[in-house]
A protein has these predicted regions:
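Active-site acidic carboxylates
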Residues: 1-92, 109, 143, 158, ...
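Histidine-anchored nucleotide/phosphate-binding helix
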Residues: 32-36, 127-137
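Secondary-structure boundary elements
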Residues: 38-40, 113-114, 136, 140
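Short, catalytically relevant binding-site loops at active-site mouths
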Residues: 51-53, 75-76, 98-100, 149-151
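Short, charged helix-to-loop "capping" segments that act as catalytic/coupling loops
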Residues: 87, 131-144
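Conserved N-terminal glycine/acidic-rich loop preference
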Residues: 92-128, 150-172
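Short beta-strands and strand-loop turn motifs
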Residues: 118, 142-147
Length: 172
């Protein structure tokens, strides 16, 4: 079984508080990956970066003082047609940090042969969760499609992909 993890493809990361040009171009690629995963009876998992109103007083908020993905705001929602693609059998994980230990626990329980990650942003949440997935499932294939994730800085994107390759995550 394959698990597809769509990382933080949320309004605030596409065209909201921390959005950047080009993030919207991932929408169709992600939709195609979701459809492909479902066609092989895989498990689709979405993560949502999730903060409260007190975000600016948190450790992350003090280092990145841009309120974003505040639960209950439009910026917290999945972006565009990806939001419409969520089905009842999908799993949605709200995470208060870059990486999700809840995702690690879930992946251990599901024990997929392959975990593919896509979404935003490559050099923060995608890399964090890819490393967590590899640690949770050291014998499973963990992949990241370079064309299905992005970040505002193309050089940071490439550096993150290089780090992932270095820890035996397959960058395709």
């Amino acid at each position: 079984m394959k698990a597809l993890v769509v990382i933080d493809y949320q309004v605030d990361f596409v065209d909201g508080a921390l959005g950047f040009p080009g993030a919207e171009k991932l929408e169709q690629i992600i939709l195609d990956k979701i459809a492909n995963c479902r066609s092989t009876e895989g498990q689709v998992i979405f993560t949502l970066d999730t903060h409260g109103e007190e975000y600016l007083s948190t450790a992350e908020g003090r280092k990145l003082p841009v309120p974003h993905c505040i639960k209950g705001t439009p910026g917290h929602a999945l972006y565009g047609r990806v939001a419409e693609a969520v089905k009842p059998d999908d799993i949605v994980i709200e995470k208060p940090a870059f990486g999700s230990l809840e995702l690690a626990d879930l992946l251990r329980r599901l024990a997929p042969e392959e975990v593919e990650l896509c979404g935003l942003v490559t050099d923060i949440c995608v890399i964090s969760n890819a490393v967590i997935a590899k640690a949770a499932l050291p014998e499973s294939r963990v992949t990241v499609d370079h064309s299905a994730c992005s970040c505002a800085d193309p050089e940071a994107h490439e550096r993150a992909l290089a780090v992932m390759r270095g820890v035996q995550i397959d960058v395709i």
